[in-house]
């Protein structure tokens, strides 16, 4: 009887040891999977991202989603269209989303307001204004002086699209307050419909909306705003400082996927990129997407890497200051966290 008890105890002990070994092995495999990008289905982490608008201007992001770059990093992305930088930042600060994707000016404003858990920019996607200036009338030989006396829909005050446009006007000898009518009464996501309904002589819109307007004879692209400026941190990813601190691995994997997306758009043709992102734009013809991407490649809008330079950040603050929207300059090393973008 005693021998039987000892035998049973021995068997139980062996089972326990084997079970513990299997658990440890499985844990190591899972950790290896996350680190290598080959993540088991049940270990994929869902991340909610609020984007400022839905545009092919952000092609590297959609490439990363559609070609599985995020999945390789163990992440599943849920995109929410915030409809403007203010809405995006509100969603981030109120913990409705994990990550915001908008102009970095939003992070500057929050820092300057003195928030203790302010937001940090951890990756930059675009380095130029991506909006196209669309005219109601066809213009064969456009110059910026033609905007004098005109009614223009440039976006909301305080946003990078508006301030960059204002900066370009000044660079071309136009006084934004006296020489034309910059109508800021219409919200960002309502500008296109307002223009189509008859409001304004010109409107600034992103692709593929600009090319769609042209195809439907509702407007004509006369200039790319970004072609008239130096490099400026136009669109970036940010999150609350506490989120970044508590989710370093997640943020690192997120940035890795964005790097892959940037590498793809900078090494492939417009047609290849269009085919990679078409599922993100089910209502847009592939030819329009291709044309829109060609426009963006022509003016070199996408970063080579997600790193934000101090020089471009300072130019952004100069533009904001000249627009009368910034009382004090925010420190680069507080608002921008390049540690993840500089990895590898």
Feature roles, as predicted:
Residues 18, 62, 108, 166, ...:
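Predominant activation on well-ordered alpha-helical scaffold segments within soluble catalytic domains
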Residues 314-344:
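Conserved C-terminal helix/tail region of periplasmic/extracytoplasmic solute-binding proteins
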Residues 106, 137, 187-281:
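Pocket-lining segment of extracytoplasmic ligand-binding domains
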Residues 1-46, 343-344:
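Short, low-complexity disordered leader/linker segments with a strong preference
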Residues 2, 38-177, 181-185, 194, ...:
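Short, glycine-/small- and polar/acidic-enriched structural segments
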